[in-house]
């Protein structure tokens, strides 16, 4: 009796490709891209612009490789998987790097891309039943070893927390909280200032989800009066720490005088605990309302800003321990025999200054920490 042995013609690792493509299909990414970036009569093959882009996104996500020249050989190795997921004939030539470069040129059209981004954001919110009312806006930098070839390029030298000696690009990003889903992205040269980037990002969020009733959580670089006034003019809310350029150290001391004199009641903040556990006290503070006015697009805008002065207990404890170490060191230094009256008086003056700092524990401005937060009043 003759039996036919099974023959293996091709072996492919499916990995996460079907999951990625199914997610993109659920979000209708291909259909949205095709609506805003039609393929045109010179487009060859059965796959559309959007379908090629979806395979490209799946490749970048799965392989962690953004190089154009690597997509075609990867598609060659996964032809059967791609055909099964897309339900169409797939050719390796559909993912040639020249075609991908042309697609990037189309995606770089700002107005068309912004319309596509709005369409995609609105559809994503509908599909996943998200609440688009709380957003977080922030900026960051990305360094590289590339050379700066022109003042018109994106990679430029600028202020960096990591490497000032390397060119960088600057990225502004708006995300939907608490999910952390990216909503809008803006890439600018690395020598741009951060402050002017917030309003354009906020405007793009408002273009997708409308104005009014949204809350934007930002860092202190978004605390410029112009940014806050713009949000007040659109009936939106904001929450951000105020830097010393907005509230000086002397103003903060004046605000804290009632606390030190025992005339200001502090509101306590507790961390929610599980059933049967005791809530943990993590902070305390107080608020005050400040009327503000500014000009936005030639119109006078007035609003009430609620400012919170907050004392984090963990942060205050760290300051307390650091101050005690410095006091002990200063006392030891002051107790040593001095060679002159000048050094003795200088050491005693330093010790006096350190002791006076004890009153500011927890409310001091050290590094990135800021005790004063501002938000547009919800009343």
Language-model features and meaning:
Residues 1-24, 34-379:
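Anion-binding and metal-coordination hotspots
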């Amino acid at each position: 009796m003759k039996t036919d042995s099974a023959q293996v013609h091709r072996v492919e690792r499916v990995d996460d490709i079907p999951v990625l493509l199914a997610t993109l299909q659920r979000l209708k990414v291909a259909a949205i891209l095709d609506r805003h970036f039609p393929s045109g009569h010179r487009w060859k093959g059965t796959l559309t612009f959007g379908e090629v882009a979806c395979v490209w996104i799946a490749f970048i996500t799965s392989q962690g490789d953004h190089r154009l020249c690597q997509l075609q050989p990867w598609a060659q190795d996964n032809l059967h998987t791609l055909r099964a997921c897309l339900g169409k004939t797939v050719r390796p030539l559909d993912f040639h790097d020249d075609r991908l470069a042309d697609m990037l040129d189309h995606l770089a059209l700002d107005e068309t891309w912004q319309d596509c981004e709005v369409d995609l954001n609105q559809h994503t919110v509908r599909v996943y039943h998200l609440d688009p009312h709380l957003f977080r806006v922030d900026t960051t930098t990305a360094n590289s070893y590339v050379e700066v070839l022109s003042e018109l390029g994106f990679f430029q030298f600028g202020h960096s927390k990591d490497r000032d000696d390397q060119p960088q690009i600057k990225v502004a990003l708006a995300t939907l909280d608490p999910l952390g889903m990216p909503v809008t992205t803006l890439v600018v040269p690395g020598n741009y200032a951060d402050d002017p980037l917030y309003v354009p990002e906020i405007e793009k969020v408002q273009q997708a989800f409308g104005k009014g009733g949204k809350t934007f959580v930002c860092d202190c670089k978004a605390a410029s009066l112009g940014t806050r006034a713009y949000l007040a003019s659109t009936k939106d809310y904001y929450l951000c720490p105020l830097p010393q350029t907005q509230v000086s150290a002397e103003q903060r001391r004046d605000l804290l005088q009632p606390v030190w004199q025992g005339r200001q009641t502090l509101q306590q903040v507790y961390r929610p605990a599980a059933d049967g556990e005791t809530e943990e006290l993590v902070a305390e503070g107080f608020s005050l309302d400040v009327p503000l006015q500014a000009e936005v697009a030639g119109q006078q805008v007035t609003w009430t800003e609620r400012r919170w002065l907050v004392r984090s207990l963990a942060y205050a404890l760290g300051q307390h321990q650091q101050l005690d170490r410095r006091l002990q060191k200063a006392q030891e230094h002051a107790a040593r025999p001095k060679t002159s009256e000048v050094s003795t008086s200088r050491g005693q003056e330093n010790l006096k200054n350190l002791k006076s700092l004890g009153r500011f524990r927890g409310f001091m401005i050290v590094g990135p920490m800021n005790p004063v937060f501002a938000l547009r009043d919800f009343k």
